[in-house]
């Protein structure tokens, strides 16, 4: 289905894009999903009771094959459905507890056992039969007895996915989330673009186009307008609790939908701006950025993870360490000092730069280093690694774009 690049050690270098779609159904699954939830909590109990803690109080989950075999056999007792669902339940349990352990180490969680409350189950591909010609997906509930059949031939996304491989399915009471896998090749891409994610803009460094900026003021305006309306209604909760809460929930839903729509248009137009590029983003964590109440509101209005998630459906994305990207000199590599506004100064090579340009350029360089390490130094154009001195000294972006709500491409404003 895809071009496969062989490396020197005969490994295939592929990047997998997962597309997800929601399809409604009317099958009576509540009893089945309740049993799945009960088994999930039982599985979490068994793993939780076997967690061991190191001297530094770091939790270690039991992962031996013997333990997992006993766990599976125990969960299969009194189970009347396909046994492969138990494998999905075990996988989900480990995922939940690994997330808890990771947050516990950072001090974000206490020693409180997670409890599953939602009704859902992961369906392995071994329980799925996909007829591409008919557009029919058959999910086994009970082997040779009970099946859930979905026909997606008339769905709006069928033409996009009809030739793709179906992946894991999330089954809920009234809807299913279908995933389809598509493979991209690193060597199909000719350029690398570094993206510096800021509060009100995306600053991009392209080795040929230089410094480009995408203005995100409209995204902040959308969130700010709805935040003001919600804050006003919160003051009325004591007088009119039901009416105010109903309107607040409605505004939250509208806010969420408008933000989602903006991000979809932004990522589509961004991927069309540089269609042959690998995008390099910082692996940012908001939790470490919270300070004052006013600044927290600003941080809440950016959506870096949502942006990365949506653009990863459309092209190849790499995440790099964000540490010191805006303060390392692009010429000599020394740490720089901040001056007034967006200017940073290097006392070693005596040059001044714009902080945003330095940030996106250093992200570009880190992404290039990661690609070279992955690909053994081949397969991606390295044009622009030795960037001209003039490109790094520019005080302003070469081009500033904004999202066009009604078009396929960005609007240029400067």
Swiss-Prot record:
GO MF terms held by the record: DNA binding; metal ion binding
Position of the signal peptide:
none
InterPro entries for the chain: Cas12f1-like_TNB, Transposase
Supply the Pfam families for this chain: Cas12f1-like_TNB (PF07282), OrfB_IS605 (PF01385)
User: What UniProt keywords apply to this chain's record, in alphabetical order?
Assistant: DNA recombination, DNA-binding, Metal-binding, Transposable element, Transposition, Zinc
Q: Which domain of life does the protein's organism represent?
A: Archaea
The processes (GO biological process) annotated in the record are: DNA recombination; transposition
Write out the residues that bind Zn(2+): 329, 332, 346, 349
**Which protein family is it in?**
In the N-terminal section; belongs to the transposase 2 family. In the C-terminal section; belongs to the transposase 35 family.
Protein's name according to its UniProt entry:
TnpB-like protein MJ1635
């Amino acid at each position: 289905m895809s071009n496969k690049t062989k490396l020197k050690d005969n490994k295939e270098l592929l990047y997998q894009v997962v597309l997800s779609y929601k399809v409604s159904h009317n099958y009576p699954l509540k009893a089945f999903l309740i049993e799945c939830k009960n088994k999930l909590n039982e599985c979490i109990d068994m793993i939780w009771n076997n967690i061991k803690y190191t001297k530094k109080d770091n939790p270690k989950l039991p992962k031996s094959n013997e333990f997992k075999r006993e766990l599976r056999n125990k969960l299969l007792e009194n189970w009347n459905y396909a046994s492969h669902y138990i494998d999905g339940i075990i996988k989900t349990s480990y995922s939940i507890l690994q997330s808890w352990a990771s947050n516990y180490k950072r001090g974000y969680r206490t020693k409180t056992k997670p409890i599953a409350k939602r009704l859902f189950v992961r369906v392995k591909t071994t329980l799925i039969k996909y007829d591409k010609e008919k557009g029919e997906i058959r999910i086994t509930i009970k082997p040779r007895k009970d099946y859930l059949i979905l026909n997606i031939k008339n769905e709006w996304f069928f033409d996009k996915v009809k030739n793709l491989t179906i992946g894991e399915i999330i089954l809920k009471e009234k809807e299913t989330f279908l995933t389809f896998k598509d493979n991209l090749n690193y060597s199909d891409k000719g350029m690398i673009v570094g993206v510096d994610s800021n509060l009100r803009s995306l600053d991009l460094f392209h080795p040929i186009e230089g410094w480009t900026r995408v203005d995100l003021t409209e995204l902040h305006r959308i969130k700010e307008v709805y935040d003001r309306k919600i804050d006003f209604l919160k003051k009325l909760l004591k007088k009119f609790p039901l009416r105010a809460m109903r309107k607040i929930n409605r505004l939250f839903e509208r806010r969420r939908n408008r933000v989602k729509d903006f991000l979809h248009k932004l990522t589509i137009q961004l991927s069309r701006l540089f269609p042959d590029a690998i995008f390099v983003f910082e692996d940012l964590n908001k939790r470490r950025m919270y300070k004052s109440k006013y600044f927290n509101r600003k941080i809440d209005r950016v959506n870096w993870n949502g942006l990365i998630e949506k653009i990863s459906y459309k092209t190849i994305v790499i995440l790099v360490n964000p540490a010191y990207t805006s303060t390392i000199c692009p010429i000599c590599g020394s740490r720089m000092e901040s001056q007034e506004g967006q200017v940073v100064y290097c006392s070693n090579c005596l040059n001044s730069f714009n902080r945003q340009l330095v940030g996106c350029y250093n992200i570009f360089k880190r992404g290039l280093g990661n690609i070279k390490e992955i690909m053994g130094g081949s397969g991606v154009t390295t044009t622009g690694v030795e960037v001209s001195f003039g490109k790094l000294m520019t005080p302003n972006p070469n081009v500033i774009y904004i999202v066009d709500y009604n078009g396929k491409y960005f609007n240029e404003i400067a």
